[in-house]
Amino acid sequence: HHLKIACFTPEQCVYPISVSHPDKRYRDRTVDFFQRHIEAAVCLDCSCMVVSTGFAYLDVDGEDAFKWAADSFSQICRKAESEGVTLALEPFTKYTTHICNEASQLLRLLRTVGSPALKGLGDTDVIATTGVDTFETFIGILGRENLAHVHFVDGNPGGHLVPGDGNLNLDQALHTLEAFDYKGYLGLEILDRRYVMNPEDAMRRALAWYSERIG
């Protein structure tokens, strides 16, 4: 069908993956995990891969966890740079981590690592659930040059729903991306269990929503 992978996403929520874990062996295993998946992305002819800080322990000092994450990403980025793969760092919600879940934290991490291979990812669901940034302020703080990928889904405010099934202002989000001249892909990260038994219908309705607005 001549399909191409727009952005490769290794599993990192179910598996024990975290660059902000206090155990160095755990972090080293995570670095190795991401480095091997960079190789997989290259094999799949995909130049973009999603990464995250993973789950963070709430009783660990935030600055320590930030340093562990920055050091780990510095190692991962060396591999990404050599393979020509851009890493799209996705913030998680405030219920998952306190290391990277808003635009200012994401930008700080990008600047600390300082690699051209490390960029940011904007997720409409995560941004709304965290409740610190609006989609517009998130993109504005991050900067167009640092935005590698977007997860574009609906929610109440969370839920990862088909566009139109939630109450997020996705039309405004599209206008924001237009205003920032975003040229990348929009990823449909549809995760709610209501779609499990009939995923084809969910995809058809999502495509119809996009077709009405993007053509």
PLM regions and their residue ranges:
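Hydrophobic residues within beta-strands of alpha/beta enzymes
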Residues: 6-8, 49-50, 87, 150, ...
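Short active-site-adjacent helix-start/loop capping segments
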Residues: 6-7, 14-18, 196
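Active-site-proximal loop/turn and secondary-structure-junction residues that shape catalytic pockets
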Residues: 11-14, 53-57, 91-95, 124-128, ...
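Active-site acidic/histidine proton-transfer and metal-coordination neighborhood
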Residues: 17-119, 129
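Histidine-acidic metal/acid-base catalytic patches
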Residues: 45-47, 100-122, 127-215
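A generic structural signal for well-ordered alpha-helical segments
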Residues: 1-2, 41, 80, 177
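Short acidic, glycine/proline-enriched helix-loop-strand junctions
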Residues: 1-4, 85
